[in-house]
Regions:
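C-terminal membrane-cytosol helix-exit motif in multi-pass small-molecule transporters
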Residues: 50-70, 261-265
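C-terminal transmembrane helical hairpin of 12-TM major facilitator-type secondary transporters
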Residues: 151-196
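Extracytoplasmic gate region of multi-pass secondary transporters
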Residues: 87-128
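Helix-to-loop junctions at the C-terminal end of transmembrane segments
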Residues: 137-149, 234-235
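Cytoplasmic helix-loop-helix junction between adjacent transmembrane helices
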Residues: 1-20
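Intracellular juxtamembrane helix-capping segments at the cytosolic ends
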Residues: 1-6, 190-204
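A late C-terminal transmembrane helix in Major Facilitator Superfamily
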Residues: 202-240
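A membrane-interface helix-boundary motif in multi-pass transporters
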Residues: 38-50, 231-256
Length: 286
């Protein structure tokens, strides 16, 4: 829908803006609802969530323009997505590249306690920094994807892998820890998913609905793999005193494999063997 509503030449930026609801919710609504549930009653929290959902549905019904000119999707045609080399390589890139985010986030409290030597009371600040980073990263992904259609996702993934790889050095002091957390938010919580989504839509052709869904499938599988690998690493005390940050380093190593998948995909496009199934001309002509 974001791609359909985008003005010409700004598809990526519009898709990224459509995804801003998630980081805004993490930054504002999640802490607010948590406070309501703890201070008042959990029933009020669920009531506010239901009310916000109803308001969102009403807003879409009132303000979204009619999209009668969009042809109904054909399930068989959508399934042809799995024969699309660019889409498959992008999905594998996300599958291997994103697991380190959960490896870092799962044990960040223990990292703060055992390595940075700070109180767990700073965790609200940590989560807020990740939320702010996610907001910045989503904006960044939109602008970068419009300027560098094939280069945006590799740049984002390369930065994310590097940030995870250097995490044992960055979590030693409070200042560098906060910088690390913010950067993980920018390139992990924000820019990664948004730039991956834009690339999938760009190459999916008439199967954009399924491609958008598979984006979430790939990242959820990355969550499973990242959490499993992280748990095994901690269980076997890999890294000694640094065992709670080692999952992020392992995530960087696996993420490098994902980056290889992505660079192969970009090579096929740059060499002319694959062509993006762009629909820029139809976007905005409604």
């Amino acid at each position: 829908m974001g791609a359909y509503l985008a003005p010409p030449g700004k598809t990526a930026r519009t898709v990224a803006n459509a995804l801003l609801g998630v980081p805004i919710a993490n930054l504002v609504m999640v802490p607010l609802i948590t406070w309501v549930g703890q201070s008042l009653n959990y029933r009020y929290a669920f009531g506010i969530i239901a009310l916000c959902g109803a308001l969102a549905c009403a807003a879409m019904f009132i303000w979204l323009p009619p999209m009668d000119d969009i042809a109904p999707s054909n399930p068989r045609q959508e399934l042809g997505l799995f024969k699309n080399r660019q889409v498959l390589l992008t999905l594998f890139a996300g599958l291997f590249g994103f697991g380190g985010f959960y490896g870092f986030l799962t044990y960040v409290t223990r990292t703060v306690e055992t390595i940075t030597k700070m109180s767990p009371s700073v965790m609200p600040i940590i989560m807020m920094l990740i939320g702010i980073g996610g907001l910045v990263g989503t904006f960044l992904a939109g602008h970068l994807s419009d300027r560098l259609p094939e280069g945006a996702f590799p740049i984002v993934m390369g930065c994310f892998v590097a940030i995870l790889a250097f995490s044992p050095l960055m979590v030693k002091t409070p200042v560098t820890l906060f910088i690390e957390v913010f950067l993980v938010g920018v390139f992990g919580a924000g820019a990664f998913s948004a730039s991956m989504q834009v690339r999938l839509i760009k190459h999916a052709g008439d199967a954009q609905n399924l491609a958008s869904s598979m984006n979430h499938v790939s990242l959820c599988l990355a969550n499973i793999i990242g959490s499993f690998v992280s748990a095994q690493a901690v269980q076997h005390h890999l890294g000694g005193d640094y065992m709670y940050i080692i999952p992020a380093v392992l995530g960087a190593a696996v993420g490098a494999v994902g980056l290889v998948f992505l660079l192969v995909a970009v090579y096929f496009v740059k060499s002319g063997k694959d062509q993006p199934a762009e629909q820029e001309q139809s976007v905005g002509e409604h």
